[in-house]
Amino acid sequence: MPSKTLSDFKDRLLKPSPKRSEKSPATKHTLPAAFAFFLISIFIPLERAFWQGIIARRRELYPHVNFDHLCFADVLRICIQTIFLAFFTALPVRDFWQFNPLARFIRAVIRLVGRIGDSIGRLGGRIIFNIGANVVKSRRRVGRKQVSKFQNSIFWAAGIVAGLLAILCITQPFNVQGQVVFLSIVLLSAWSLTHIKARISLMLLFVLSVTVSGRYLWWRYTSTIHADGAISLFLSCLLLAAETYAFIVMVLGYFQVCWPLDRRPKRLPADRSTWPTVDIFIPTYNESLEVIKPTVFAAKNLDWPEDKINVYILDDGSRDWVEDFAKAAGVHYIKRDEHNHAKAGNINNAMKLTSGEFITIYDCDHVPSSDFLTSTVGWLVHDKKIALVQTPHHFYSPDPFEKNLHLDRAMPFENSLFHDYIQKGNDTWNAVMFCGSNAVMRRSALEEIGGIAVETVTEDAHTSLKLNRRGWKSACISKPLASGLSTESLSAHIGQRIRWARGMIQIFRLDNPLLKKGLTLPQRLCFMNAMIHFLHGLPRIIFLLAPLPYMFFDIYVIYATAAAIFAYVIPHMVHAAITNQQLQRGYRYPFLGGVYETVLSWYILLPTTVALIFPHKGKFNVTAKGMTIDKKYVDWHIATPVLILMVLNLLGLAIGIYKTVTAADPQVSTLIINIAWIAYNLLVLGAAFAVAVEEIMEHPLPRVPLKAGAVVTTSDGTKHAVSVVEFSQTELVLDMKGLAADESVVIEMTGNGHTDTFKATVAREAKGFTEFDLVFESVEDEIRFNRQTFAREGHWGDKFDSHVDDRFITGFLRLVGFAAYGFKSLVEFLPGTAGRFVRYVVSFLPRMPKASVGL
């Protein structure tokens, strides 16, 4: 006889739903449920204790089955899920890894290789330390003035020798077996170098990566092009051209950052009366007051003598309310009658009306800390040939990638690689690029080149190129001294990148750094790499489509055996991945670079192509900032190209699996290679689609973490010393509890050499903290609050989160998670009949239980 558990289960299944109306009789529910129970009981002995335990945990084990409203299809869902649970959760992964002999052998090999790598790393570290010590002694002997010549001679000599050896290694012919042996040795060397924490080890990784990738490219040019018809030849050459482009960008990138310069602020003279005059330019066009306010107030709070600083709002929108705000805030207001040349024209117009020795430019959403000028102007005073000091662009609101992929706050943002690392490499070669904001410029240098460049839509990069061509120096301070608003939506983000891509290609055509006079060779290479980087649209699309001709039409784009492909392609990819991981560690998470490029590739393809042919076409578009998103949705307009590529790759995957099952043995290995390629493409495309799923913005004004203390005085006079958690323009979140809603308090904060108090009311208690609404009675109150928060000295450089695991395998697993979220969102949001059909089919797929289960 069935137990009470089984009886209760049967009663619940056959019980009519209380939500059914008279027009929907209970039989519509009970008949399918009864039939389902009958079918299940035929195949499964439900009366046994094991299955009674399953029944008791049915909602946990079968999360996609609604046991209150069973239907005929649920029989199949339950059967599929049961098989899945039996095969994939019967033995926990930990037990498999611990008791399986093969797994134990693999683990032992990994430990052995790890010990060898650690030993080599320690030995290499000692050798490199001794080399470094000798170099330091040599520097002391040759003297300070001769150090740069000594370093340059060593660098160029080593570079020439390494280049000759690399050419020899690249062109030396090997058979497949010899290639495997050679690259195994190189791979072991590269892996060992990752254990050595020294700059020279990274340079050696560059050499190995260029050698392996160069050898792959040599093999591609000499052995894999087969004229088996015009279409096959065209597709082969197209892929080879894309790979050549990627190789060139990779080599230039290695050169750019081979010896980054971590420049620190230069101390100003102790006598503040000798400090130079500075004009602060804040250009604006159509931004809201909420966007402009923090920047203007922070400019007012800059640590600089009052008689030597002037703040100007440059309003290209000619709005009366902006002029009124400028008067209330105590800053200057400039507008112009003719609105030509967009932002560049706006700044050039202001230059005619001002006279400061130096000019500082902030986009109207970029908020500086109070020490911005004291940390940057020192270099301009110290070296009269420096025309530009650029600081990193950081952002206090999440960009679409952070927001929509739910990235940890500790993970580097999309721009971090360029602003925090590549710019240091540019500084080594005197090729720092002006980024349009968060920079100080020498007025006389700008006047010498005719002001900000107006010939292209990326006036900032073009201006720095012109300055370098005239012999002026540029520098960057690696310390974050300002932070801004990210683009809130993916469409706005793409619009901004389209302008950047178009502008850089315009410079490439109109003022090519390789052809014009006045630049050193390293400067030419740095600027060239920055420009051709934005040509990645077509190569990226080619890589996403390359395996499909073979799947659809049996057309070879790489004419080679599977063994040769493994011997050449895999080492090329692995070395590039290892080197980039070491190069970008702390500045970009593994595999996210491919996702960034995939999202943008379709959209920058046409603008860059047009700019190559018609460089004078295109106009400046203002990036939208300060918008809000109050509902989760998929931006189908933006996601359509990714969706098309996903469908094509899914079709290719299905055809590939079918061919693998039915093909002759010699073709299987080639099919497996193409299937693996398509599978990786689908991971990248799935993650790219996930970025198009716009998440809700929790707060109308972005909240910013802050490390600071505060004293709260409640209505009864009690004082509480607390910590600040985060803030916005009108809110403050403190680490305290127990206050009544709407209670009036006074909050005291100390920072930047001042103690300020603010009135506030308790808004709510949430997540263990108390949120306060600030009560500002004047503009001066807002300026003082800005001084304690946005403009707080050193604030933008604070680190708030622990380190994020950025190992290679962790990055790949995270990519898989992003892709899974993207495909899940596609199923969830796909509209119309197609969406309903896909969701119905997907409902049969098994899924992991809601909790860890061992059957």
Question: PLM features: what roles do these ranges have?
Answer:
Residues D315-V322, E338-H339:
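A conserved acidic beta->alpha catalytic loop
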Residues K632-L855:
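Structured alpha-helical
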Residues T277-D279, N310, H462:
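Cell-envelope/extracellular polymer assembly enzymes that use nucleotide-activated donors
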Residues D363-V367:
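The conserved acidic donor/metal-binding loop of glycosyltransferases
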Residues P2-R272, H536-F543, P666, L671-E694, ...:
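N-terminal membrane-anchoring/stem segments of glycan-assembly enzymes
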Residues F297-K308:
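Short, acidic, metal-binding catalytic loop of nucleotide-sugar glycosyltransferases
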Residues Q177-V181, I185-A242, H533-K619, V634-P700:
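Membrane-embedded multi-pass helical conduit in multi-pass membrane proteins
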